[in-house]
Amino acid sequence: MENRWQVMIVWQVDRMRINTWKSLVKYHMHISRKARGWFYRHHFESTHPRISSEVHIPLGEARLVITTYWGLNTGEREWHLGQGVSIEWRLKRYSTQVEPGLADQLIHMHYFDCFSESAIRKAILGRVVRPRCNYPAGHKQVGTLQYLALTALVAPKKIKPPLPSVRKLVEDRWNKPQKTRGHRGSHTMNGH
């Protein structure tokens, strides 16, 4: 019988970022109660030696599973130190991997207050708009003009500590696109 390999995307993340993510998840599960229904599985509850933790986030019938790993091969940089994160969407026996932005949107739609189409209509008519969007990380990069006007009208509340964002967890802070000088003096452009 030959070996079967399963390949999955694991985002390389530094250890401190993973620790921050875990503490934010635990805080919002146990203290603020904004993450009601989430399940945190510790490393000693897993049979896999490389899994450091799992966070199960119910999304209706489906669930999002964010798994953190340790002891992986070290990455390109010395600060990676073999830490990583995978993000999976599961429904019954089906599972697929999702990117961090989509994971944030799924969490946002199910767990946090946000504007709706009716809120935009109410604001245009001059009525009071509630609720505020408490989780702006769950929105796409550029919203509609109405949404942008609404966010200017009703600013989100600053929540301390912030809500856990999967996109922030896997964000690469060190490998920003390198700036190079253009052919006209000091103008800069992305060097790809």
Curated annotation (Swiss-Prot):
Per the record, its GO cellular-component terms are: host cell cytoplasm; host cell plasma membrane; membrane; virion component
What residue spans carry the region label Interaction with host APOBEC3F? Answer: 14-17, 74-79
Motif window: HCCH motif: 108-139
> What modifications follow translation?
Processed in virion by the viral protease. Highly phosphorylated on serine and threonine residues.
Highest taxon above the source species:
Viruses
Residues modified as Phosphothreonine: 96, 188
Q: Does the keyword Cell membrane apply?
A: no
Membrane topology of the entry:
Peripheral membrane protein
- Annotated region described as Interaction with host APOBEC3G, given as residue ranges: 40-44
> Could you tell me where this protein is found in the cell?
Host cytoplasm; Host cell membrane; Virion
**Basic residues: bias regions:** 176-186
Task: Write out the ranges of the annotated region (RNA-binding).
Answer: 75-114
Residues that, per the record, bind Zn(2+): 108, 114, 133, 139
A GO molecular function for this record? RNA binding
Region named Interaction with host APOBEC3F and APOBEC3G: 54-72
Q: Where is this region: Disordered?
A: 172-192
Region annotation SOCS box-like: residue ranges? 151-180
Q: Which residues carry this modification: Phosphoserine?
A: 165
Description of what induces expression = Expressed late during infection in a Rev-dependent manner.
Query: Which GO BP terms, alphabetically?
Result: viral life cycle
Question: Where in this protein would one find the motif BC-box-like motif, according to its record?
Answer: 144-153
What family classification does the UniProt entry report for this protein? Belongs to the primate lentivirus group Vif protein family.
User: Subunit info?
Assistant: Homomultimer; in vitro and presumably in vivo. Interacts with viral RNA and Pr55Gag precursor; these interactions mediate Vif incorporation into the virion. Interacts with the viral reverse transcriptase. Forms cullin-5-RING E3 ubiquitin-protein ligase complex (ECS complex) by interacting with host CUL5, RBX2, elongin BC complex (ELOB and ELOC) and CBFB/CBF-beta. Within the ECS complex, Vif interacts directly with host CUL5, ELOC and APOBEC (APOBEC3F and APOBEC3G) substrates.
Task of the protein: Counteracts the innate antiviral activity of host APOBEC3F and APOBEC3G by promoting their ubiquitination and degradation. Acts as a substrate recognition component of an E3 ubiquitin-protein ligase complex: mechanistically, Vif hijacks a host cullin-5-RING E3 ubiquitin-protein ligase complex (ECS complex) and the transcription coactivator CBFB/CBF-beta to form an active E3 ubiquitin-protein ligase complex that targets APOBEC3G and APOBEC3F for polyubiquitination, leading to their degradation by the proteasome.
Protein name, UniProt field: Virion infectivity factor
